[in-house]
Amino acid sequence: MDQIGNRMALAAFKFLATIGEFRRNRQGNVAIIFAVALMPIMAAAGIGVDLSRAYLVKAHLTQALDAAGLAVAGSPGASEEYLETLAQDFFNANYPTTAMGVPGELHLNLGDNVVTLSATATLPTSLLGIFGVDEMDVGSEIEVTRENKALEIVMVLDNTGSMGSSGKLDAMKEAATSLVNILFGDNPDLDKIHIGLVPFAAGVNVGTDFPTSALDMTGASSIHKENFKFSAQPTVDNLWDLYDEIDDRSWSGCVQTRPEPLDELDTPPVSGDSLWVPWFAPDERSSGYYNNYLSDADSSQGNGKEQKDLSKYMSSHLGSTSRGPNYGCTMRPLTPLTNDKDLLLSDINAMNASGVTHIPVGLAWGWRVISPEEPFSEGREYNDLDVDKAVILLTDGSNVLGTASNHNRSRYTAYGYVRRGRLGTTNSGAAEARLDPKTADICENIKDEGVRLYTITFKVSDTETQALMEGCATSPALYFDSPSNEELQTVFQAIARDLSNLRLSR
């Protein structure tokens, strides 16, 4: 019999004892007889009221214990002292002071794969006090069993210029660090947890150690030579040759998007358009443009011809200018799936804010990092039942192409120039409008593979972007709308615990 049942039995015993006293006293009158008749009704009412209150308290206790148990089981590598504090904090937060009953000590027991939590609350009675039962002890116990599954997570994080304001970048770093710490706990590595990072802005930096087999090394892609007239310079045949002509610059690791529809797909790189073309921002004119870093050989040629002219690159030296062929490649290199906690924390801390927002580019690379397909091979197969995969996408703004009122019609980004029509149009506004549908398409592609997709709009007021991100998430419950700097850490902590592959057993 549970504690509530024991208290009810005690109340019934005391009630019968009281009836016995009345029966032994034969000097009563009608009032006493009436009182005796009334007492069963009062007792029944008292038992009903206090029993209902007791079960309500038990429900409060169980809910609070569930929250605490999930928090503890979601921190597999943490110390016992930390877990005890964590459990108490979550229990307190979910057992409000307005709840009935005063909770006693929280008991935590840690097994290999099972976390057991119990607590008891003391509940003052109402009507049962008449029969000498002044309080009741109501207890609850839960077990949380960790499933022995692996976890692969990729955080696709906005590193655009707007993240540098209002403390947003630091808040994001702190939140992402919190997620890593929760999942890894005190362990420097865990065999079954692997996390990747994809910082994005106007593109993504895949790193200079990206496999050459996935890069277009010879100019085979249809977009490789679109900005230059290579036929006029026989010693230069592709963008790699052009980098070699600049003695103080080399490729920084950013790549262009593949031609449509490959820009939205995880098709392995094999040949031609499936290969990635290196980022190479051309030297532009000095007036009305963004990226002027070389003297034009013949300024009378006109905007387009001057930009295509390769002669100015031959044996060139750029010096200290911040402009050049890597202009716009401001992002830190992505981090493939790894279980190296220190590496993850270091790469998160190194992120910086610069550039415009290309959500589909970042999201597509997040998918490729978690995919079992090349160019990254760290991810396990989608149909592997022993692993859960998740992508966390955070943005602080709408998709922006970086349009311009010059002949290029935009800044140079991962999509090249708008004038080249790689977004299906040469109109700047129409090209920018294509970015939202692309984002939605990639979201669906990711979800179709069974990958869990979380989305966060960070201090975003634009309702269209909010709707886009909510639709991208696996479910509305996995979309988090515009948290403050302080709330962002709570969001990442909630996501970390949701990803802990837990089930409750009682």
Feature names for model-found ranges:
Residues G77-E81, L151, T160-E373, S377-K389, ...:
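Divalent-cation-coordinating short motifs within acidic/hydroxyl- or histidine-rich contexts, strongest
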Residues T120, V156-N159, V198-A201, L394-G397, ...:
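Active-site-proximal beta-strand/loop segments in catalytic clefts of secreted hydrolases
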Residues D2-G5, F13, S126-S166, A175-N181, ...:
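Low-complexity, S/T/G/P-rich flexible repeat/linker segments used as non-globular hinges
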Residues D2-E84, G161-G164, A473:
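Alpha-helical assembly-interface signal, strongest on the long, hydrophobic N-terminal helix that forms
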Residues A71-A73, T116-S118, G139-T145, E152-V156, ...:
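Soluble periplasmic/extracytoplasmic beta-strand elements of cell-envelope proteins
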Residues L16-A37, V102-G104, L110-I153, M163-S166, ...:
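Acidic, polar low-complexity linker/tail segments
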Residues F91-A99, T212, I442-R506:
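Von Willebrand factor A/integrin I-like adhesion domains
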